[in-house]
């Protein structure tokens, strides 16, 4: 009992010391409550399509950039440029990659897709992310959709202008997943 008494006093002391454990509000987090579409639909829910597009743009950009760093030769402008065969393969692999790092979490009562390349501003101190399930397949299909819609050549040209240009190509424009018109339509629903 003697060993447990000092431990108990130490714990009680921490609660009494200003700035100790007792001054902090308890941290709580709950998993996002997913509706039927978010749980069972084969397609990416409309309110998450902008995040999905940005995730796809990030993965394409990152994979192309990694492939370029592996090149030993540069073009006349000093920039490393992939051959059509290589960038086509890299983009195909980007879509078939494992998307397990992505999932959904709720921040300020808004469900958002989260994962590499999607951070916006300060992260919440605690949150719960739902991963796996339909999300990897949905992201892979979204990636394949953009690959088919724009083609490898146009995507690689945008990549060469920078990550922002690639994201603007895939997600911007009047009908893009992140356009204000599409966002306004989502809010009306």
Swiss-Prot record:
Induction entry: Down-regulated in primary B-cells early after ligand-stimulated activation. Up-regulated in bacterial lipopolysaccharides (LPS)-stimulated peritoneal macrophages.
A family per Pfam: DUF3456
Signal peptide: 1-22
Motif (Prevents secretion from ER): 186-189
Annotated GO CC locations: cytoplasm; endoplasmic reticulum chaperone complex; endoplasmic reticulum lumen; extracellular region
Entry similarity comment: Belongs to the MZB1 family.
PANTHER family, per the entry: MARGINAL ZONE B- AND B1-CELL-SPECIFIC PROTEIN
Function (record text): Associates with immunoglobulin M (IgM) heavy and light chains and promotes IgM assembly and secretion. May exert its effect by acting as a molecular chaperone or as an oxidoreductase as it displays a low level of oxidoreductase activity. Isoform 2 may be involved in regulation of apoptosis. Helps to diversify peripheral B-cell functions by regulating Ca(2+) stores, antibody secretion and integrin activation.
The protein's name in its UniProt record: Marginal zone B- and B1-cell-specific protein
